[in-house]
């Protein structure tokens, strides 16, 4: 199952300029998802990060993974209409710069859910090359 940007916006509350998932290619609700962020020079962040050498901030790559995790978990009927809140980031490793023109492939696996909290393991790649990986803790409110 894949999701368009319109379907993504029905699931998570994020909107421009903070919506960082453009398309979901695969989803197993409550378990895992694969999606994409198309990185373009038109994004506001590149006006200052950095002029003349635009680089996507690592925290936004983590946020994109967290949003994809939100899509995966909020796709379950029992969480419809809720909001995913970032609780913690562990073992984040940044391996490659991401620049305008790159397509960031996002993959998240929900490894634990207990009550309103859970943990996802995410990885983002560009052309098969690892850009970032992290363990993300979230709350559902």
Curated annotation (Swiss-Prot):
Substrates-to-products reaction catalysed: a (3R)-hydroxyacyl-[ACP] = a (2E)-enoyl-[ACP] + H2O
Gene Ontology molecular function terms on file: (3R)-hydroxyacyl-[acyl-carrier-protein] dehydratase activity
Keyword rRNA processing: no
First-listed, main subcellular location of the protein, grouped into a coarse class: cytoplasm
Keywords: Cytoplasm, Lipid A biosynthesis, Lipid biosynthesis, Lipid metabolism, Lyase
EC main group: lyase
E.C. code: 4.2.1.59
Compartmental location: Cytoplasm
Signal peptide: none
Keyword set includes Cytoplasm: yes
Domain of life of the source: Bacteria
GO cellular component: cytoplasm; membrane
Job description of the protein: Involved in unsaturated fatty acids biosynthesis. Catalyzes the dehydration of short chain beta-hydroxyacyl-ACPs and long chain saturated and unsaturated beta-hydroxyacyl-ACPs.
NCBIfam families: fabZ, PRK00006.1
Family (UniProt): Belongs to the thioester dehydratase family. FabZ subfamily.
Protein name: 3-hydroxyacyl-[acyl-carrier-protein] dehydratase FabZ
Organism this protein belongs to: Clostridium acetobutylicum (strain ATCC 824 / DSM 792 / JCM 1419 / IAM 19013 / LMG 5710 / NBRC 13948 / NRRL B-527 / VKM B-1787 / 2291 / W)
Gene giving rise to this polypeptide: fabZ
